[in-house]
Regions:
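Acidic, low-complexity, intrinsically disordered interaction modules
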Residues: 27-77
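Mixed-charge, Lys/Arg-enriched low-complexity segments
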Residues: 1-24, 28, 75-89
Length: 89
């Protein structure tokens, strides 16, 4: 069984919004691109979200989504609430 990993690009407007929110909150983000993992000769695939590391906290984001997941996919907030969250940590 062979797993194929393809890196996906950040949606430019999403990255700009995240950079703006982080700049306004006076924090420095580290961006790590997500990927698509496909199992060869099947129709199975997994989309690994982009990671944004801020103050030792990993935020997960998907292209074309307004949700931000904190540490894992169980806890999410809206992108509009991110500034408030960053100021609270």
């Amino acid at each position: 069984m062979k797993i194929i990993k393809e890196e996906i690009q950040f949606e430019e407007s999403l990255k700009q919004r995240l950079e703006f929110i982080c700049e306004f909150s006076k924090v420095n983000p580290t961006f790590i691109k997500g990927s698509i993992r496909k199992i060869e000769k099947t129709n199975l695939s997994y989309i690994e979200p982009h990671k944004v590391i801020v103050k030792n906290t990993t935020l997960l984001v998907f292209n074309y989504s307004n949700d931000v997941y904190i540490t894992n996919l169980a806890k999410k907030i809206k992108l509009s609430e991110l500034e408030t969250y960053l100021k609270s940590i």
